Amino acid sequence: MKALIIDPAVHSLGGHHFNAVQRLRDELAGLGVAAPCLGSAYADRRVVDELACTPTFTRSVYGRLYATPGEFTDSVEETGRQLAEAMRRSGTPDLIILPCCDQVSAMALARQLRRSWSRPRPRILLWLLYGPHHLKTPDDPAAANLDGEARAAFAELAGSAGSIEAYCETPEMADFYRNLVPFGVGVMAGPGLPARARAARAAGRPPVVSCIGFANRAKGYRLMPQALQHVLGRHGDVRFMIHGIVKGSDAEADQPLFDRLAELGERVEVRQEVLASDEYLARLAEADLLLLPYAPDVYRRRGSGVFADAHHVGIPVVAPKECAFARPAFEGGWGVAMKAYDGKSLGIAVLEALDRLEPLGACAAEAAGRAQDGLGRVLSASVEGKTGRSSGLASLLRRFRPRTTPGSA
């Protein structure tokens, strides 16, 4: 069978888009299925080589401004042209996976599949990571006018695909989409790197508090200077490792913030390089406490790939009380909630977590032991279902094929 991964946002090494495609390809390879990728037109050479990625899309899923009513139509047309050209060369696959699907990708793919009416309709596996506006929670009245375009796009995709299996990362986001799309929506974290066992913290070693990932504005890095100063003045041993990539993010002008953090002294390590998968996992495993001060006005319903990784590794977290992704940690005893969204509240939450680090860590380790990674099962079912369907169709066609009799030409 043929599989294809589509993610217009994958363009460089590191980050959860790269990790998602890499994990999907590895899992599918284990099932004997090759899965090339269509990614950003600006994908660098390592992405092209390591992910079998064809640079395709000039618009990222994060590239919309939502400024005019015609922007959606323009985005669909441009994405559709680029998708049609790429699939003209590669052919229509049996299985299409979109690890980060929005309404533009959905509508463009639906129209492309309608053009390929003579071919068997593919099975589609997709994740809906955010609402119709990627920078606003679906509850925001300013995003409500986008519900119509999303409803139309996913309805058209449902009518063009053989079947659709869809997931959100939180129950709250899944509830929103169940009222918007004509297919079922489950709850499962997006494809991430396989969990790696973490060594227990050595007795007497100072605790390490970390923040890691792309430094987009909604990730809350602007709260760090005040928070770290608050903690450093009240805790004599703690060490901070603050990793944030500003290049390619929407916060490239925030470099002075990281310069300020680097001036806070020897107990603060600041890193900004792109991390390969192994480096990311190694850095994550060093953390005794993970900071996820994500803006609630963006992440109220959304999931977090870093949180999912922390869950599987067994790391306590600090996050805003409103963020749905962190609710399992709050309820499971391995998360501390920020009472307000500002730097001082982040610092207070960190101090609370440091005072309770041993029981928080024990609960995090217990939660990690119970965590289930369902990606392999889902992909296996998708491959087996599609292969069985293709075999059944081939058998049916053979029944109607003219037979060659002895003596016939």
Over which residues does each language-model region extend?
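Nucleotide-sugar-dependent
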Residues: L292-A308, P320-E322, A326-R327
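A short, active-site helix/loop in glycosyltransferases that binds the activated sugar's phosphate group
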Residues: K136, P141-V185
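Short N-terminal targeting/anchoring amphipathic segment
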Residues: E71-D74, L83-A106, L125
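Conserved donor-binding/catalytic core segment of Leloir-type glycosyltransferases
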Residues: A199-K219, P225-L232, F240-M241
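A charged, aromatic-enriched C-terminal amphipathic alpha-helix characteristic of glycosyltransferases
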Residues: H16, A340-I348, L354-R398
